[in-house]
């Protein structure tokens, strides 16, 4: 049934209860942090309730981010698939675009480690036992399968290699969640 046939009810509901991409991402961020808090403080019942709510929203929007994996300032730029291995380590103020993956390279011990300020572009994959330095920007559809030791650079390509000296510090990070 269209909005016109509903007498404008749908548009009124959208005005009163706006649900935008930012609202969903903010809700995910709050649930992720609440789940981490209650899990770390060993509030068993609250932790279970938060985990159920978190897993529902993660499955609905394909945001598979494990608890206690990311530092403060995590930014998910858009709703879409974001996949992280359960043992991955992500530093502070990192940003992820849609369709990104931080995954193991064959064994569960070989997981990526991202330092502070890393920006992961659309469709990028960080694969295996890889260490990515501070303020590195990973380009769209890049596959990072080797360590990136130099700070504040941009890498792109398959396999990823340095393409410029402008890294995550130069990235537009006005979008805060």
Task: Give the role of each language-model region.
Residues 1-61, 167-177:
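Terminal amphipathic alpha-helical/low-complexity segments used for targeting or macromolecular assembly
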């Amino acid at each position: 049934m269209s909005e016109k046939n509903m007498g404008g009810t749908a548009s009124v509901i959208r005005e009163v209860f706006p649900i935008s991409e930012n609202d969903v991402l903010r809700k995910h961020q709050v649930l992720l942090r609440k789940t981490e808090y209650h899990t770390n403080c060993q509030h068993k019942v609250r932790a279970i309730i938060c985990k159920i709510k978190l897993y529902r929203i993660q499955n609905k929007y394909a945001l598979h981010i494990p608890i206690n994996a990311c530092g403060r300032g995590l930014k998910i730029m858009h709703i879409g698939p974001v996949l992280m291995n359960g043992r991955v380590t992500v530093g502070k103020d990192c940003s992820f675009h849609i369709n990104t993956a931080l995954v193991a390279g064959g064994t569960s011990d070989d997981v990526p480690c991202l330092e502070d300020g890393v920006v992961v572009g659309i469709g990028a994959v960080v694969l295996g036992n890889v260490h990515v330095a501070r303020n590195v920007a990973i380009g769209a559809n890049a596959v990072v399968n080797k360590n990136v030791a130099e700070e504040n650079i941009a890498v792109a390509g398959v396999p990823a290699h340095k393409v410029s000296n402008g890294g995550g510090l130069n990235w537009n990070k006005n979008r805060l969640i």
